[in-house]
A protein has these predicted regions:
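Cleavable N-terminal export/targeting peptides
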Residues: 1-25
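Short loop/turn motifs that connect adjacent beta-strands in outer-membrane beta-barrel proteins
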Residues: 19-23, 56-61, 91, 130-136, ...
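Outer-membrane beta-barrel initiation region
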Residues: 22-54
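Transmembrane beta-strand segments that form the barrel wall of outer-membrane beta-barrel proteins
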Residues: 28-34, 59-70, 90-98, 105-109, ...
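Residue-level signature of outer-membrane beta-barrel architecture
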Residues: 32, 53-55, 83-85, 94, ...
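Outer-membrane pore/translocation modules
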Residues: 70-163, 189-200
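Outer membrane beta-barrel transmembrane domains
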Residues: 175-215, 221-223
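Outer-membrane beta-barrel "beta-signal"
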Residues: 207, 233-246
């Protein structure tokens, strides 16, 4: 189901944008951990890489995203399609974390059977208000397929993460973004848990400070971020730099 959906979106984007110019982009970030929606996915020295192909005057992107750490206990490889326009952005990301020691199926990359697969398809719709004085970001993400199952592995739970973010400060190359997110399951399947926590509620709050550091003729985007999860009573600090931006 996931591969069919991704293929359909890719074909649709291609048919709409065949005559437009295309661009290849490569980024690589160095960070002390990987934080995602209230969770610390991995810690240690990490490299997170994004290789993408953008076409249709910037309205469509096909990409590969990967992450690993120096300890060798975190390995992730995803592919995605993104469509954007008029302030909206839709992204379908097929996520596969095959880190050693995982409690799910981390050995069969091409297994797309709902009750066996170790991957999940996360679909996100973002909207950024276009008014310069009110650049609020609103986001809705639902896991449509994969390892977001009921305890008896008979139903998909469609865990959903909703998020709002606002740039509270922007001056002299500095930017400060504040955000908050909550999670719940569209199909509770008789359970309280969802993909992000033990029950519905706020699982993510963050404050991120970014700066474009000038080193000679080079610009290195750097950031520091605090993230708090009130449900799990955990907090994390992240610092990172984008070493490659092509």
């Amino acid at each position: 189901k996931t591969s069919i959906l991704a293929s359909a979106m890719c074909l649709a984007a291609s048919s709409l944008c065949q005559t437009a110019s295309a661009q290849i982009h490569l980024t690589a970030d160095l960070q002390n951990n990987h934080l995602w929606r209230g969770m610390e996915v991995a810690d240690g020295c990490l490299i997170l890489t994004d290789l993408s192909y953008t076409f249709g005057a910037g309205h469509a992107t096909l990409g590969l995203w990967g992450g690993t750490n120096t300890q060798g206990n975190y390995k992730e490889f995803n592919h995605y399609v993104t469509l954007r326009g008029a302030g909206f952005e839709f992204c379908a990301m097929d996520t596969y974390n095959f880190s050693p020691g995982a409690t799910y199926n981390n050995r069969q990359y091409f297994n797309y059977k709902a009750h066996q697969t170790g991957r999940f398809l996360n679909c996100t719709l973002n909207y950024r208000f276009q008014q310069p004085r009110f650049p609020l970001l609103l986001s809705w993400s639902t896991i449509m397929f994969g390892r977001d199952r009921s305890a008896d592995n008979t139903e998909q739970k469609y865990s959903t993460f909703v998020y709002a973010e606002y740039p509270v400060y922007k001056k002299d190359g500095w930017q400060v973004d504040a955000g908050v997110g909550g999670a719940f399951a569209l199909n509770k399947a008789g359970e309280k848990q969802n993909f992000y926590g033990e029950t519905s509620g706020v699982v993510h709050a963050q404050l991120k400070v970014s700066y474009d550091l000038k080193i000679g003729s080079y610009t290195v985007p750097v950031h520091a971020m605090g993230m708090w999860n009130p449900q799990s009573e955990k907090a994390y600090f992240q610092i990172g730099a984008q070493l490659i931006h092509l």
